Amino acid sequence: MIQERTILNVADNSGARFAMCIKVLGGSKRRYANIGDVIKVTVKEAIPKAKVKKGDVLQAVIVRTKKGIRRIDGSIIRFDNNACVLLNDTNMQPLGTRIFGPVTRELRYANFVRIISLAPEVL
């Protein structure tokens, strides 16, 4: 579960290393976000000469959480870290051209098929 001020790893090659959630999108009183939800983030640390720089405010989709996600068959998939993929604000496509680490199948149901196709492993 991701809430405001949560620090996330960035799982793409857009140049950002860490991002902080500043708003959970989808309703005025919504507090928490899970895998597949879109959030508003600010870049906290970035590499030099990258597509994004520190302080940029972007949208991101959550791809991994420590809390995990429960499947219909009863299994729970948990990860070691909280991670997101930065999105282009206009067309909701990923900013980077590569995705690092595994992602879950639930992103397909949230219409992020491009992230699924770029990911090295889909659980």
From Swiss-Prot:
Cellular component terms (Gene Ontology): cytosolic large ribosomal subunit
Task performed by this protein: Binds to 23S rRNA. Forms part of two intersubunit bridges in the 70S ribosome.
InterPro entries per UniProt: Ribosomal_uL14, Ribosomal_uL14_bac-type, Ribosomal_uL14_CS, Ribosomal_uL14_sf
Record has DNA damage as a keyword: no
Entry's family note: Belongs to the universal ribosomal protein uL14 family.
Protein name: Large ribosomal subunit protein uL14
Any one of the GO BP annotations: translation
Molecular-function GO term, any one: structural constituent of ribosome
Keyword Ribonucleoprotein set for record: yes
Keywords on record: Ribonucleoprotein, Ribosomal protein, RNA-binding, rRNA-binding
Superkingdom classification of source: Bacteria
Subunit structure: Part of the 50S ribosomal subunit. Forms a cluster with proteins L3 and L19. In the 70S ribosome, L14 and L19 interact and together make contacts with the 16S rRNA in bridges B5 and B8.
One Pfam family named in its UniProt record: Ribosomal_L14
Signal peptide per UniProt: none
